[in-house]
A protein has these predicted regions:
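HAD-like small-molecule phosphatases
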Residues: 1-48
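A general structural motif
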Residues: 2, 65-67, 87, 238, ...
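A short acidic, often aromatic-flanked loop/helix-cap motif at beta-alpha or helix-coil junctions
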Residues: 5-6, 42-45, 98-99, 109-112, ...
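Short, glycine/serine-rich, charged loops/turns that create anion-binding
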Residues: 11-12, 75, 97, 161, ...
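Short, well-ordered coil/turn elements that cap or connect secondary structure elements
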Residues: 30-31, 85, 365
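Mg2+-dependent phosphoryl-transfer enzymes with acidic/Ser/Thr/Gly-rich catalytic loops
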Residues: 53-125
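Acidic, mature catalytic/reactive cores of soluble proteins
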Residues: 125-482
């Protein structure tokens, strides 16, 4: 209550309470522009107009709440009760007229009801269909990054670069927010998943089916300007395979329409052309609100099927210069040749190498910036509101990542980051005006905003893009530069 004071007089002798209240009402309460509100054994003096109803509205907007549960026993709580609507629940505690929908008489019952509500919410979050964060695998081409769930589902991918709008965001909004899934037609919930050697090429295996996923790193793509990216999915084995292609433009905020073309699919009406090359797949388009989803079923008989999601081109023709199998080989070689040069410790060497590969995958090749994460809005605590967009380059965090790779014998990332940071310093109005974070291209991060269309990971809202920390003063920002 930064603009008011509350005078409580519960558990005070009546004569002393009466005297204190009289002095307050004949004193400060009579001053100009002081607003007085009386409740149960409390008097509030405020210098601005405010109420519990205003507070409810502000909190609802701040956390993106879809419903509010409010218990109150005071006359001042009526301001909150009258603001509740729709699925909200209002409960009056005690006697007296009230705008609340429900009533309980025993204050101790409030604790019991809240405990039951907390238990139900905890069970909901634990049982939500959210794959544990640590079970996701990372794909990267040094510009675009994607997450793959244990069932070979692309659940997160932004393009044309890591901090761009999401094309698939099931991670934060469930299936309706977009995914790209390959799975056996007959359900099998126990696939095995592992990286192919010391690389970011991922293999998901069922008894009769293997899906190999990678973002193409051949032909120098990791250091090329963002805008042309290929996600390749190679399907091998025998039996019937179900493919679900459900892109959702801009986190699902824009209608996503698909066009069936010879050799694959095209996402209609996009700023940058996006196509899915899928030779031999017969597609059915399903209407899902303002979006369309393509579903195809293919029977494999030993020959591999290769799907190519091409961002930045409208061509569905087969690439002659570098066929998918050669790009697979070169992408694997790109990661393994880098990992082979690391000076790994004797203890837990494979785990350290895998961690180093993740850090390398977070390096933005065209400029040298290093992002803090490939994602936005994964919660610090399930159900909480501390869900931030970390798809940017913090001077401090990036310096720590570069330092870790230097300790393992890889210096190129630190040199590239230094070039990125020097460019940021050159553009700064003055050294003391350095911000804690910048985009991967070294420019100011946009204003923080919330995406109300997404329910959040395991119900953790709000989902944010941008980061308000850009306006903070963090003195440790000068350490990495020094």
């Amino acid at each position: 209550k930064p603009a008011s004071i509350a005078f409580h007089y519960r558990n005070v002798a009546n004569d002393k309470a009466d005297k204190a209240v009289d002095e307050l009402l004949t004193g400060a309460a009579t001053w100009d522009d002081v607003r007085v509100k009386s409740g149960k054994k409390v008097i509030e003096l405020a210098v601005v107009h405010t109420s519990k109803g205003d507070c409810i509205d502000a909190l609802r907007h701040r956390v993106g709440a879809t419903a509010v549960v409010y218990f109150g026993d005071d006359i001042t709580d009526e301001d909150a009760f009258v603001r509740l609507h729709g699925p909200d629940v209002s409960v009056k505690v005690g006697t007296g007229e009230s705008a609340a929908t429900f009533r309980i008489h025993d204050p101790t019952e409030v604790a019991r009801r809240l405990a039951r509500l907390a238990s139900a919410r905890e069970a909901f979050l634990a049982g939500a269909d959210a794959v544990p964060i640590e079970r996701h695998a990372l794909l990267s081409d040094g510009r675009v990054m994607a997450l793959v769930s244990p069932g070979a589902k692309i659940s997160w991918m932004c393009a044309p670069r890591v901090d761009g709008p999401a094309l698939f965001s099931e991670l934060l909004g469930g299936p309706a927010a977009g995914h790209f899934t390959v799975e056996p037609s007959q359900p099998d919930n126990n696939p095995q998943q592992q990286y192919d050697g010391a690389s970011l090429v991922l293999k998901t295996t069922w008894p009769r089916l293997t899906v190999t996923d990678f973002l193409d790193c051949s032909a120098g793509k990791p250091t090329q300007r963002a805008g042309r990216t290929d996600l390749i999915r190679q399907i091998e084995g025998r039996g019937e395979v179900r493919i679900t292609f459900a892109p959702r433009l801009d986190f699902g905020r824009l209608p996503t329409r698909l066009v069936i073309r010879d050799g694959g699919l095209e996402i209609d009406d996009t700023i940058d052309p996006i196509v899915l090359r899928a030779p031999g797949v017969e597609w059915e388009l399903l209407e899902e609100g303002s979006h369309q989803t393509a579903v195809g079923t293919v029977t494999l008989r030993g020959e591999p099927l290769r799907l190519e999601l091409r961002y930045g081109t409208g061509s569905l023709r087969e690439q002659q210069t570098l066929p998918p199998q050669e790009r697979h080989r070169r992408t694997k070689l790109y990661w393994e040749s880098w990992a082979d040069r690391l000076a790994l410790p004797k203890r837990e060497g494979p785990l350290v190498r895998r961690s180093a590969l993740v850090l390398k995958g977070l390096c933005y090749g065209p400029t040298g910036g290093i992002v803090a994460a490939a994602t936005t809005s994964l919660p610090e605590h399930l159900g909480g509101i501390r869900n931030w967009d970390y798809r940017y380059c913090w001077l401090r965090d990036a310096a720590m990542s570069a330092s870790a790779l230097v300790k393992l014998g890889s210096f190129s990332e630190a040199m590239a980051f230094l070039d990125w940071m020097l460019a940021v310093v050159d553009r700064a109005a003055a050294p003391e005006r350095l911000m804690p974070l910048y985009t991967v291209t070294g420019h100011e991060v946009g204003a923080e905003a919330e995406i109300a269309e997404l329910a959040g990971y395991a119900g953790s809202r709000p989902v944010r893009v941008g980061n308000a920390a850009r306006g903070q003063v963090q003195l440790d920002v000068f350490g990495p530069i020094a």
